Amino acid sequence: MATSHSLGEKILVKLIRFYQLAISPMIGPRCRFTPTCSCYGIEAIKTHGALKGSWLTLKRILKCHPLSKGGYDPVPPKINNNVEKK
């Protein structure tokens, strides 16, 4: 089943896609992580929503610098707090 995304999420994803298609090719590959920071941002926003996804993306971008080791850094899974505990 497809999930519905808010207008804010759609706008943020479009901005990241614009960066991927128009800006990133001009500056070349620079990300030290897998998935790339822009792919991470799209996945974080789609998984966690506009606010938390943006926060996770900002934290990730701040970690992506020449002194960073980089490596595999996936988007954390969404935790469902509505699950009944037995």
Swiss-Prot record:
It is a peripheral membrane protein. Keywords: Cell inner membrane, Cell membrane, Membrane. It holds the Pfam family YidD. One of its GO terms (cellular component) is plasma membrane. The lineage of its organism: Bacteria, Pseudomonadati, Pseudomonadota, Gammaproteobacteria, Pasteurellales. This is Putative membrane protein insertion efficiency factor. Could be involved in insertion of integral membrane proteins into the membrane. It comes from the Bacteria. Belongs to the UPF0161 family. It is found in: Cell inner membrane.
